[in-house]
Regions:
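Extended, low-polarity transmembrane helix blocks
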Residues: 1-27, 43-153, 170-214
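Membrane-interface interhelical connector segments
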Residues: 25-40, 152-171
Length: 214
């Protein structure tokens, strides 16, 4: 379990950041997909504040072992909500892969929450192991989506790479796409999976690793 500590803490810190951003940009102009989802819903400000409260609660609770499971459950549910909000958009634009990519962006966070939830179960039950496997392979599927999305929008991905970084924008767009593909293979095969997940965390923090088409 000790190997999970850093990832769990970072997972919570990101959730806290989402909560703060939701509170600061409650006018829905924040550059975050989570906030924009509420754009056309009635009483959307109340929903944004509620989401912010869940992010903050879950992000703080997940920092301590005694409350980590409750925090993971709260975060898993809110991320699942955001993932499901993309389903009608996918149905409306089934030929635009970016919509699927946005779903898997959120579902990757659901998968992370599932892993934390299962890891901090009070006993080593079969149910906990099953939830952990679902989270693990769910995340692996999301990594496949990250790879496919960059393949479809390679030029857009390249545009996010600063021009001054050698050897060039397209080089790094192709390189990160290959990195995602190798990580997916590692996760599904179980070989170097821990290393792959750690490198993925760093890769996902880079602006070159995602492009969104509005």
């Amino acid at each position: 379990m000790s190997k999970l500590y850093l990832g769990r803490h970072m997972f919570g810190i990101v959730a806290i950041a989402f909560g703060v951003i939701a509170l600061v940009w409650h006018d829905f102009n924040a550059p975050w997909q989570q906030i924009r989802v509420f754009g056309n819903l009635p009483h959307r400000e109340v929903l944004v504040y509620l989401a912010a409260a869940i992010f903050l609660f879950g992000g703080v609770a997940i920092q301590w072992s005694r409350t980590a499971r409750g925090g993971a459950l709260a975060l898993g549910l809110i991320y699942l909500f955001f993932a499901l909000m993309w389903v009608p958009i996918i149905l409306g634009e089934p030929k635009v892969y970016d919509r699927y990519g946005n779903f898997f962006e959120q579902f990757s966070l659901v998968s992370g929450a599932l892993i934390v939830y299962a890891t901090f179960a009070r006993d080593d039950s079969k149910s906990a192991a099953r939830w952990a496997r679902i989270g693990y392979y769910g995340f692996a599927v999301c990594v496949v989506s990250f790879t496919v999305e960059q393949l479809f929008y390679l030029s857009g991905t390249a545009s996010f790479v600063p021009k001054w970084i050698p050897p060039g924008q397209m080089f790094w767009a192709i390189a990160t796409t290959i990195f995602f593909a190798l990580a997916a293979i590692a996760l599904f095969s179980g070989r170097s999976a821990l290393l792959a997940s750690r490198l993925l965390t760093r890769l996902r923090l880079r602006p070159t690793s995602h492009v969104s088409v509005d």
